[in-house]
Amino acid sequence: MSTSFMKSPRLFFTSESVTEGHPDKICDQVSDAVLDAFLSHDPRARVACETATTTGLIVVIGEVTYEQGYIPIEEIVRKTIKDIGYTDAAYGFDADTCGVMVAIHGQSPDIAQGVNRALEVRSDGQVTEEEVATIGAGDQGMMFGFACNETPELMPLPIALAHRIGRRLSRLRKDGVLPYLRPDGKSQVTIEYSYGRPVRVDTVLVSNQHAPDVTQEQIRHDIIHHVIHEVIPNDLLDEKTKYFVNPTGRFVIGGPMGDSGLTGRKIIVDTYGGMARHGGGAFSGKDPTKVDRSAAYACRWVAKNVVAAGLADRFEIQVSYAIGVARPLSISVECFGTNKVPEETIVRLIDEHFDLRPGAIIRDLRLRRPIYRPTAAYGHFGRDDIDAPWEQTDRAEALRRAAGL
């Protein structure tokens, strides 16, 4: 999002979310459920787990290094699918009868030698363990974090509302309030902004898989009244707000029967709905030595604390890494003209108050725990309903004092 966003008197921005039964999200959840199982068995396990699904089939592949022991991967896969709600063959996909293929092998020793012991430690005997993290970055790349004061959770409003709709659809389905709903679905929200502030909801789009015997009129009525009006504040809706509910007119065939799915294909849904940049690396199925995940979490932690401290109203941070090297290669920030102190000061304060080496991130955010399965649906950020330590604003007051605010 450029600084022109803050200067425009009228601008529209759209973000989407998907429900937990979307084929790509099935794969994300399976990958993270497998990751959690390995971390429960061995907190230092190295895991890179990818999943694919299509009609009647789940395929789990990847690389794992862990203390030996039995991990019942097929059982984990079936339980995850059942928890999502694919429990009936009439849906075209169900936990009890789908095929499960598993092809997981050991991690490359070439990668492991760099991750196990960072370049700074391996190459210089004079450097002490206290000065550098012992864990090098698991790959090269750049990661972004973002926060803004549009919502209490310091997330962009379009993606926040899209996720709320998705969670509400899931709750009403699982509680039996709208029993004709099935697991697959999508939501999309368009917000009208004026000079960088959200002023109204322009458009809401909801598509949800359903039983064949329900009318489109009933679906539209129920979703508008029991979903949209329950999660979107009334003061954001007006007579010009447009509602699209299952605009194709029918959504009976869905889930893996309708579309194949893959881990890592919903990275914008997982993050900020397109309001911020993305480094390209997906999260699910990756243990915290993979900076695609852990550094992106740390960047969100930094960004949320910067905004909570009042240093800026909108804030984006980029960090970059080299494989096997612990220290970030670069840190850059963008405040979109909303900063209360110079950006150079903010970079200095970040360096003073946050250690962005992978080992330090894992330590400070307690990332070796099996906490990842719940993150794999309805966004990794802005969550207060799951264990997400990167959402804490524990350093905001220290940043505020250090900035003299």
Swiss-Prot record:
One Pfam family it belongs to: S-AdoMet_synt_N
Positions that bind L-methionine: E63, Q107, D259, K290
Subcellular location: Cytoplasm
Keywords assigned: ATP-binding, Cytoplasm, Magnesium, Metal-binding, Nucleotide-binding, One-carbon metabolism, Potassium, Transferase
Cellular component annotations (GO), alphabetically ordered: cytoplasm
Cofactor note: Binds 2 divalent ions per subunit. Binds 1 potassium ion per subunit.
Principal place of residence: cytoplasm
MF annotations from Gene Ontology: ATP binding; magnesium ion binding; methionine adenosyltransferase activity
Chain positions recorded as K(+) binding sites: E50
Quaternary data: Homotetramer; dimer of dimers.
Function: Catalyzes the formation of S-adenosylmethionine (AdoMet) from methionine and ATP. The overall synthetic reaction is composed of two sequential steps, AdoMet formation and the subsequent tripolyphosphate hydrolysis which occurs prior to release of AdoMet from the enzyme.
Protein name per Swiss-Prot or TrEMBL: S-adenosylmethionine synthase
Organism: Roseiflexus castenholzii (strain DSM 13941 / HLO8)
